[in-house]
Amino acid sequence: MRLIQNMCTITEYPPGTHTECASSSAGTASSRVIKIAVVGGSGVGKTALVVRFLTKRFIGDYERNAGNLYSRQVQIDGMNLAIQVQDTPGVQINDQNLDSNEQLNKSLRWADAVVIVFSITDCKSFDLISRLHQHARQLHPDNRIPIVIVANKADLLHLKQVEPQHGLQLANMLGCTFYEVSVSENYIDVYNAFQVLCKEISKQQNTGTPERRKNSLIPRPKSPNMQDLKRRFKQALSAKVRTATSV
């Protein structure tokens, strides 16, 4: 996977809307779009995972997200792809009825693939995986939507509540690929998780109907706008500076 254009914030969307970036230069070739939803419990590191993948940077403190949709141009096996990554608000552990979570449902229906994230330091977030997996499958009854399970915070061994083999066993049982990562310390593992999904979706789209292949094309983004992400970085850095000053 090769980056061919900088990450672009598409939108912080109102409920029910997904808008796209416009193209960075008129007349450029179209790119096939790949849509990935990142879901999981609160505080497991979904936003950090997305930002790490898109920018290779890690900042530990983020404001609670309202559901940001990001785009990045990449090249896989010589094909230009526009990856759209939907960062979703955390699912509450006590949310017994996922059907009523409108924002989650819209994100899952929109997606071509799903990343389910849990934290090895939070066994309750691990308990959500099966429910989220089943829910995603129910929303795509006629399509074998690719799903990757990511165990985050692998560096926090002293706080570990979930053993790696438990995550791997569950992923195997559900028929999913499994990655244990430390978003804060290892970019490569994060990259690999998304690369696997991109290749699998691209393969599915290549074997789809002509109409499906036609619908998967969108214009390349133009006028990249990173203001939203830069604002988050500045807020996080400012908070750290204030904390250090007050000590």
From Swiss-Prot:
GTP binds at residues 40-47, 87-91, 152-155. GO terms for biological process: mesendoderm development. Its EC number is 3.6.5.2. Residues 29-247 are annotated as: Small GTPase-like. CDD domains: RERG_RasL11_like (cd04146). GO terms for molecular function: G protein activity; GTP binding. SUPFAM superfamilies: P-loop containing nucleoside triphosphate hydrolases. It catalyses: GTP + H2O = GDP + phosphate + H(+). Keywords: GTP-binding, Hydrolase, Nucleotide-binding. InterPro entries: P-loop_NTPase, Ras-related_GTPase, Small_GTP-bd, Small_GTPase. The keyword GTP-binding applies. Residues 205-228 are annotated as: Disordered. PANTHER family: RAS-LIKE FAMILY MEMBER 11 (PTHR45704). Belongs to the small GTPase superfamily. Ras family. This is Ras-like protein family member 11B. It comes from Xenopus tropicalis.
